[in-house]
Structure formats: structure tokens, C-alpha cells
């Protein structure tokens, strides 16, 4: 089968925004204008097409990143049909992992901001992730029809808060209830959308006289920015020559693809204005798969390699999301980077070294699906029938194996114990949690060995609430949930040398003998654990050394101080002794764990706690109460600035003090303040609190 759309006309984009910036409505309008949806779904009715999980419709927030395919030929039908694959990304900080996952497989992004709220805290997290993966982006300032809408303030915030070189491509005509349309600063024309047909048709008109001076000023700004694209253009600009429309667009595209500028569009998705022109900007200024660098990976022997976006290269793809579908089981969403895959083909999961058969292949439109026979380089689709694929795995042809760059997922910061309400649900709960953990790599499940409780851990309270909720809805498992527990860690502050560990047992027959001498020392934050073997002259034979490392690693899982995982500790093995007959790997394992325990307690052990970055936006009247409350929670106020609806307070607060904060903040500010929270760092727990935590653990 030949390729239906040339790869140069593909756009793989993500639509990303803070909660409530109107991202889902924007996506809905895109689906409407591209002709996929004939009735516009509104978020407030709970009918939006992209938000297809029940909870999303109830909460009005987007949780699952759904991938949708649509076609666009321009609002004036001025382009050849372009294939646009949209990955809808959640805006809530507990779902940052979803955003990270989708950024990994995108070529470009549309950042949606609210014209009233501007750049909100969560927007910065998403921006950082887009920077990490070098994703070119354009901005869409939405909700221009809302009271307090201010386009230029939002543009300014992209510069100051996100350090993005924002260049307006349009200006709004009017604002709030007088928002009429936009000025196209390239064409220097006003665009007026027809309200009778929900903005499907439009007219170019002259710019209103009162807005002309402002439009000319910003047109000049656009031209100056474009001149930076090359020396030839700069010469032309300095020589006073005009740029043609084609030259201007080519220069702006070039700069946008190099991530040197962020072009800014505006509109009101709800009022059917602006989304159409923003789609044109996606086609004109965001990359096709051939405009971004080839994907890097490594071959089986570790040699670096890359795959180019052509159908002629061997097939390679990255699985970026697993979703459980009530009708077909597991759906594996994947981005095909090179080659072609057909339904029925056998592929290799090179990360797990397992051969899998691709059953059916579907292309998703939100929650409707179309079955297709093949997927070519540059496309995004979902496969049914892959059994053992998790997020971040590479799929490729067996004859040319490659492992594409892995994704990195953060460690969870909060855990709760869950138990099924009835014994009959025990097995179902295990199955459900296993399924959910496969879908979401930032969610972990394990059994606490001491209490035999099932523990689930994730990125925040909302994250775990939604997991429990999904267990109830999708798997019909009712569960009791314990109090949230903080994921403390243990480490040491001092170095201790020459710690002896000796395990000798003589009880008739063959005995056990292992003897080690180690140094134990702190490492810098985030270094984890290192083991150095400095044994000279064979005082411990080589075959027993792995046993020493194993013995210490086992101790790291449950530290000597309070049974929490140990981090950032180094061990150097430099002396010991052995017995010709009685020594074994097991004996050295026991000796090493004895030495580690004793050394750890001498090396000034401390408890570390997760500290969260908290941002509270509050009306000024409640400022004192909010700051006082954060101080009471052991918070360190990092800064304050003016926010769109009051003051923005940034603080670092220990997670242990943040439980139930949403309710307390609501009652302290009569529901007028909002906050967002994300993991910041691990820091030493104050002595009195550490003592209480340790005693509570020991009394269990």
C-alpha cells in the first residue's frame, strides 16, 4: 500500500496547558473544524470527545493522553491536506508523567494559556519538559472573551516566567465581551469569523483604523525577529527592503524549528474564534517528522545508532502509553520512527528481548477507533494484542534490533495502604493494580513485608485517589484506603572507616565463615549507592565479592534507622579474611550486612523527607493567613509576586505537612485561593520530627 500523505505533510503535536486554560475545548474545536466531529462537545456538559474516561468527564479535567488523527487543508483551503496527529496532554501536576511521555514522541507543541490567568505555575513544568526534549512550540492565548483578558500581558509572562522569546503572530481585535476576531500580522489583515456557521467560514478585512498603529508596531517586531534567521535577511532588512510574505513565513518557520522563537496566536475556542488560524500556524510553523533530528538509540552491543523517518529503513517504534480498553484489552500507543509495520507482523521488544505479534492496528479518534492495515514512519497508532510491552519499550524488526532512548520516570513521593473490602476482591485487586501499574510507570505497587499490606505509591494525593477510583469503576473492586504515608529516605552525614563485620558459625560439620572490613561514606545528593572493591592480595577471593555487594544492597531496601530506603551512601571494601572450607557467598553476604548496619548507625544517620514546591494564588486580603499557615507547616517562603487574580506565593513545604491542605486552604480563603504542588527535593528532617517518625515505625 502506498503512503496516503507524504511525511513532509505530517504534524505530530501535543496540546498542553494548565488546568482550565481551555485545552480540551481547544482540541474539541480542532476536531470540529478538521471535520471529524460534527457536533461540538462542550466540557461543561461532560460531552467532550477527548476526555473519554468517566472520571475526566466528572472532574472536567483530562487524565488520559488520547491520540487523535485529523486532516487540515487550511482555513482558506490554501494547503494540500496535512495529517495532524494530536496527543492531548493533562495539565494537572499529578499527571506530569503523562505530559513527559507525550513530549517524548511529539515533534511540536501548542501551549494553551488563559488570557486572564496567563502563565500559571503548572505551565512552567510543562515548558521545562518541552525544553528537555527540545520540542518547537507555538502559543495560543485562549479565552480572549473572558473578563480580565489581556493578550499582551500573557505574551510578556511567556518572556519573564518561561524565558521564552515570544513573538506575536496576531493581535486580538477587542477583548472580553467585545472580542471580535484577530489581526494577522503577516498579511496585515483582520480576520473575521462567521458566527452563523460556528466559525467555519471567514473573511479578510481591513484592519480597523484605531488598531492600525498598534498593528504596524507589532508587524515591525515580527519583521525584526524574522531578520535574525539569516545574514542575507538581516542585510535585506538593514537595507530597508520589504520581505515578501513567503520570505517572512520561511524565516519565522526556520526560527521556530530552531526553538529560537515562540510564535503567539490568540482567540476564544469557546466562541469559535482563533482556533482555525492557530491550526494554520501549526502547519506553517511546526515541524514535520523530517524537520526534527533522527531518533537516537543503541544497538545490541551498545554502539550508538539512529533511525531516520523514511519507509525504507528498518521498522522502529516507541511505545509511549498503555491503555486498558473494556472491549479489546490492552491498547499500546506507539510512534513509528522508521520503516513500516503491518497488522499480523512479528516484532521484537528489544528492551525485554521478547518477540511479539502485532494483532490489529487501530488509529484512534479520541475514543472511536478505525482499524488500519499498516503504520508508516512518522505516524502514531495503537496496537492490539501486544502482551508484554510497557511504556518506554522499543519495538523493532528482529533483523535490525535497536533500543531507542529510554524515558526516565520519577520515584513516587506518597504512598497509602489499600485493602479490598471483601476477601473475594483480593485477587481482583491484585490484577487491577497490576494492570494500572503497567499503564502508568509513575505508579508503584508492592506488599509491605512486615504488615503484609498492599501499598500503592504515586506522585500526589490526586494521583492515588484516581487510581482507587479507577479500581472501583473499571475493575469493580471496592477498597479501603489507609492514611497517606510519606516516602522518607535514610542517609549518613559522616564517614566511618574500618568497620568490621564477622560471621562465624561452628556447629559440627561444615561451618560458615565470612569477615569483611569496610569504609562507609556519604555521597552527593542523587548519587544513589556505589560499591568499590579495594581488596589487595586476595585476602577475600573474587568469587565472594558479589556476596558482599548483595548483602549491602539488601540492607539498602530497609535502612537501620527506621526501615526506610537508604540513599546516597558509598561503601569501600578493603580488607577481610576467609576460611578455605567454611567460607561461602552467603557467609560474606551476612558479614557485609552486619558491617553495614553497624557502620551506618555510627556515621551520623539522618532521615530525609520529600519537600514540595508549592505555589498558592490568593486574593490579597488572605495573603497574611496563607503565609502564616505555610510557616506553621514548616514552609520556607521563596518569593511572592503579583498573579493574575491576586498574589502568587512560592514556598518549599515538607510533604508530611501538606496532607489535607486543599481543604484547609479552601476554608481559610472561602474557596478563593488555589494551589499547585510538585516534588522539589529530599531534605533532612528536623530532629524532633525525625525522632517521632522513627519511634512510630519502631512501635509498629
UniProtKB/Swiss-Prot annotation:
The terms under GO molecular function for this entry are: GTP binding; GTPase activity; guanosine tetraphosphate binding; translation elongation factor activity
PROSITE patterns in the record: G_TR_1, G_TR_2
Checking InterPro entries in the record gives: EFG_II, EFG_III, EFG_III/V, EFG_IV, EFG_V, EFG_V-like, EFTu-like_2, G_TR_CS
- Which subcellular locations apply to this protein? Cytoplasm
Q: Provide this UniProt record's keywords sorted from A to Z.
A: Cytoplasm, Elongation factor, GTP-binding, Nucleotide-binding, Protein biosynthesis
What positions does the domain tr-type G occupy?
8-290
Tell me which Gene Ontology terms the entry assigns under biological process. ribosome disassembly
Which Pfam families does the protein's record reference?
Answer: EFG_C (PF00679), EFG_III (PF14492), EFG_IV (PF03764), GTP_EFTU (PF00009), GTP_EFTU_D2 (PF03144)
| UniProt: GTP binding residues | 17-24, 88-92, 142-145
A GO term from the CC aspect: cytoplasm
Q: What does this protein do?
A: Catalyzes the GTP-dependent ribosomal translocation step during translation elongation. During this step, the ribosome changes from the pre-translocational (PRE) to the post-translocational (POST) state as the newly formed A-site-bound peptidyl-tRNA and P-site-bound deacylated tRNA move to the P and E sites, respectively. Catalyzes the coordinated movement of the two tRNA molecules, the mRNA and conformational changes in the ribosome.
Return the similarity comment: Belongs to the TRAFAC class translation factor GTPase superfamily. Classic translation factor GTPase family. EF-G/EF-2 subfamily.
**Protein's recorded name:** Elongation factor G
Q: Tell me the lineage of the source organism.
A: Bacteria, Pseudomonadati, Pseudomonadota, Gammaproteobacteria, Aeromonadales
Question: Which gene carries the instructions for this protein?
Answer: fusA
Amino acid at each position: 500500500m502506498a503512503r496516503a500523505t507524504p511525511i513532509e505533510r505530517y504534524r505530530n503535536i501535543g496540546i498542553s496547558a494548565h488546568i482550565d486554560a481551555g485545552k480540551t475545548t481547544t482540541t474539541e474545536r480542532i476536531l470540529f473544524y478538521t471535520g471529524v466531529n460534527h457536533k461540538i462537545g462542550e466540557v461543561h456538559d461532560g460531552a467532550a470527545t477527548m476526555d473519554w474516561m468517566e472520571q475526566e468527564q466528572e472532574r472536567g479535567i483530562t487524565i488520559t493522553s488520547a491520540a487523535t488523527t485529523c486532516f487540515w487543508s487550511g482555513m482558506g483551503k490554501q494547503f494540500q491536506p496535512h495529517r495532524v496527529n494530536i496527543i492531548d496532554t493533562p495539565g494537572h501536576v499529578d499527571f506530569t508523567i503523562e505530559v513527559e511521555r507525550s513530549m517524548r514522541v511529539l515533534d511540536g507543541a501548542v501551549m494553551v494559556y488563559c488570557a486572564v490567568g496567563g502563565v500559571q505555575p503548572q505551565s512552567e513544568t510543562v515548558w521545562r519538559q518541552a525544553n528537555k526534549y527540545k520540542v518547537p512550540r507555538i502559543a495560543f492565548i485562549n479565552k480572549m472573551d473572558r473578563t480580565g483578558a489581556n493578550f499582551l500581558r500573557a505574551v510578556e509572562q511567556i518572556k519573564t516566567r518561561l524565558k521564552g522569546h515570544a513573538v506575536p503572530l496576531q493581535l486580538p481585535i477587542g477583548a472580553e465581551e467585545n472580542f471580535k476576531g484577530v489581526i494577522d500580522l503577516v498579511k496585515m489583515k483582520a480576520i473575521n469569523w462567521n458566527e452563523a456557521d460556528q466559525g467555519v467560514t471567514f473573511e479578510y478585512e481591513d484592519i480597523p483604523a484605531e488598531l492600525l498603529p498598534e498593528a504596524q508596531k507589532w508587524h515591525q517586531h515580527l519583521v525584526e525577529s524574522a531578520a535574525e534567521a539569516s545574514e542575507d535577511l538581516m542585510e535585506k532588512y538593514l537595507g530597508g527592503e520589504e520581505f515578501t510574505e513567503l520570505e517572512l513565513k520561511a524565516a519565522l518557520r526556520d526560527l521556530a524549528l530552531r526553538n529560537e522563537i515562540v510564535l503567539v496566536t490568540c482567540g476564544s475556542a469557546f466562541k469559535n474564534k482563533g482556533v482555525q488560524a492557530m491550526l494554520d500556524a501549526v502547519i506553517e510553523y511546526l515541524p514535520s517528522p523530517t524537520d526534527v533530528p533522527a531518533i537516537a538509540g543503541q544497538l545490541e552491543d551498545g554502539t550508538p545508532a539512529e533511525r531516520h523517518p523514511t519507509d525504507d529503513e528498518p521498522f522502529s517504534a516507541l511505545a509511549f502509553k498503555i491503555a486498558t480498553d473494556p472491549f479489546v484489552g490492552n491498547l499500546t500507543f506507539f510512534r513509528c520512527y522508521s520503516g513500516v509495520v503491518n497488522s499480523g507482523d512479528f516484532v521484537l521488544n528489544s528492551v525485554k528481548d521478547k518477540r511479539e505479534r502485532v494483532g490489529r492496528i487501530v488509529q484512534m479518534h479520541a475514543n472511536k477507533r478505525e482499524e488500519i492495515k499498516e503504520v508508516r514512519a512518522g505516524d502514531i497508532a495503537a496496537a492490539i494484542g501486544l502482551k508484554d510491552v510497557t511504556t518506554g519499550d522499543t519495538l523493532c524488526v528482529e533483523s535490525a534490533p535497536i533500543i531507542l532512548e529510554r524515558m526516565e520516570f520519577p520515584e513516587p513521593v506518597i504512598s497509602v495502604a489499600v485493602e479490598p473490602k471483601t476477601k473475594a476482591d483480593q485477587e481482583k485487586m491484585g490484577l487491577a493494580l497490576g494492570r494500572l501499574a503497567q499503564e502508568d510507570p509513575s505508579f508503584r505497587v508492592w506488599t509491605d513485608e512486615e504488615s503484609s499490606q498492599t501499598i500503592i505509591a504515586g506522585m500526589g494525593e490526586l494521583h492515588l485517589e484516581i487510581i482507587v477510583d479507577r479500581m472501583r469503576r473499571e475493575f469493580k473492586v471496592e477498597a479501603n484506603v489507609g492514611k497517606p504515608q510519606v516516602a522518607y529516605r535514610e542517609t549518613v552525614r559522616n564517614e566511618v572507616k574500618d568497620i568490621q563485620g564477622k560471621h562465624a558459625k561452628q556447629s559440627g560439620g561444615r561451618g560458615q565463615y565470612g569477615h569483611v572490613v569496610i569504609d562507609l561514606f556519604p555521597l552527593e545528593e542523587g548519587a544513589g549507592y556505589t560499591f568499590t572493591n579495594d581488596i589487595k592480595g586476595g585476602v577475600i577471593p573474587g568469587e565472594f565479592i558479589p556476596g558482599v555487594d548483595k548483602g549491602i544492597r539488601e540492607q539498602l531496601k530497609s535502612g537501620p534507622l527506621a526501615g526506610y530506603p537508604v540513599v546516597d551512601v558509598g561503601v569501600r571494601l578493603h580488607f577481610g579474611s576467609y576460611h578455605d572450607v567454611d567460607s561461602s557467598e552467603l557467609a560474606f553476604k551476612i558479614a557485609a550486612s552486619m558491617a553495614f548496619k553497624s557502620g551506618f548507625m555510627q556515621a551520623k544517620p539522618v532521615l530525609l523527607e520529600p519537600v514540595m514546591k508549592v505555589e498558592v494564588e490568593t486574593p490579597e486580603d488572605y495573603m497574611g493567613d496563607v503565609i502564616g499557615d505555610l510557616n506553621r507547616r514548616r514552609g520556607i517562603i521563596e518569593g511572592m509576586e503579583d498573579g493574575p487574580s491576586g498574589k502568587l506565593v512560592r514556598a518549599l513545604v515538607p510533604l508530611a505537612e501538606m496532607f489535607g491542605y486543599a481543604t484547609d486552604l479552601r476554608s481559610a480563603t472561602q474557596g478563593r485561593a488555589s494551589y499547585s504542588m510538585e516534588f522539589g527535593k529530599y531534605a533532612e528532617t528536623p530532629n524532633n520530627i525525625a525522632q517521632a517518625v522513627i519511634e512510630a515505625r519502631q512501635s509498629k
